[in-house]
Amino acid sequence: MTYTDTVRKTFAITTPLYYVNDLPHIGSAYTTMAADAVARFERLRGKAVLMITGTDEHGQKIQRTAESNGLQPQEHCDKIAAGFDALWQKLNIQYDRFSRTTSPRHEAIVKEFFGRVWDKGDIYLGQQKGWYCVSCEEFKEERELLEGHRCSIHPNKEAEWRDEQNYFFALSKYQSQLEALFQERPDFIQPESRRNEVLSFVAQGLQDFSISRVNVDWGFPMPVDPNQTIYVWFDALLGYVTALLDPDSEPSLEKALEKWWPINLHLIGKDILRFHAVYWPAMLMSAGLPVSGHVFGHGFLTKDGQKMGKSLGNTLDPVELVNRYGADAIRYYFLKEIEFGKDGDFSETRFVDIVNADLANDLGNLLNRTLKMVQKYCNALVPNVNGEDIPADHPLKAIGLELSDRTSVAYEALAFSEACREIFTLVRACNKFIDEQAPWSLYKQGNSAAVEQVLYAVLESVRLSAYLLSPIIPNISTDIYQQLGFSLNFNEKTLINNSVTYDTHATWGTLPAQQQLGEPRPVFVRLEQA
């Protein structure tokens, strides 16, 4: 799988619009860290990038949660949305748009989109009977429920029996078009396991789904029936479209879609796959709009091999984690250690071991000891060596020359683990190379030319590694670059394309000779086991 579109110069990526029933959990952080890494990588490559995140703020569950806390629904939404934004700042998430589905601009988009689908004849009034999970905000079929009519996703909450008139979207009308989409674009849904889930679901025959609710005040009124409110998914999915609007533009579909549509990549958890891979493309087809590029559903997270839950007392608070360990350590562990797309586990012991071994020992110590040798042997200047003069079969150059291509393939496949493995192959080769070449011995022998070539090759390999790791650990990469004499911050996204040309910086051998180096300092302080 690759999300790359070589024709378009723009790149739009979304996280889900997170439901504001509660403060963000580690799963929300995981999705958003991955999306941020992709967005940063595409900015490095010179694309105009739009990263969208935000909050889904309507529905009965929100209304009930707000009431139970003695708040008005909007007060509750404002509080939780601020919590998401605060966590994104702590995790160094560089989103471009934060979409909130309670905004007046969003209501205008929803009404216009509804009008298109209504005019197409794809919305009708019907009777809905069945078991309704308030937490999922959807009706459940009998086969989806556990004993006692409990939702399999929310087993602690019993579903409610509902018998009401609602408006429906004619999803079944798009059965053949969706099947054609999945056949013509086999990489539309990824990974393969998620695609197979969707194909199996669609093969059972699609059922029309309700897009309105009665007796729910917290939502946009139905344009054709003010006694009903628009159901959360027909409202929430359009938050991606609203986010495409420039801040000062009129809220219309034409304005929203003129630059960034179709969105290249929706990153989601597998629990909301059906809505993004089936409902959403059918809605877009009905409105006469192009379908998004790709939908990627990642796996669930466990802790110490167990499913997380408040009842088990083993939830992971992402705010507490980042306050204790720092953003880069958290980003690195979750993106490197968990194969994106599969379920993954967090173990605090393993977390500390991994980041200490990779970031403190292999990468941090390598930079530190090399800079100290350059201080001692080369007056704190990059050795006077031209990277082009180093033979192609040099043990570090041979890896470095292929590293950008190999890492790009991994990033494009959302294989963050593989990208890290490729990069650390070079880092570990550097440590081995220094030990074998022993520049301190070469210096004592008076072989200054050999010393300079050894140290240049290592410094350049560290630079390239930091550059290619910057989408994942931007703070550490910035620190490394600045110690190597560059006045560069990988967090300055508006400047990154101008100051860091990808073709130059992703190529081994471009570290300028005689560049003044900074004072060596640790880029990552070892963590202690709790």
Which role does the model predict for each range below?
Residues 1-10, 50, 54, 126-131, ...:
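Basic, alpha-helical terminal appendages of large translation-related enzymes
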Residues 65-78:
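A charged helix-plus-loop insertion that forms the helical arch/lid used to bind
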Residues 2-53, 105-109, 155, 160-376, ...:
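Structured secondary-structure scaffolds
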Residues 55-61:
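Short, charge-patterned binding micro-sites
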Residues 120-175, 179:
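Cys/His-rich short segments
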Residues 339-342, 346-350, 355, 370-419:
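Long, amphipathic alpha-helical stalk/connector segments used for oligomerization, subunit docking
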Residues 360, 364, 397, 401, ...:
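Generic structural concept
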Residues 76-132:
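A broadly conserved sequence feature marking short terminus-proximal activation segments
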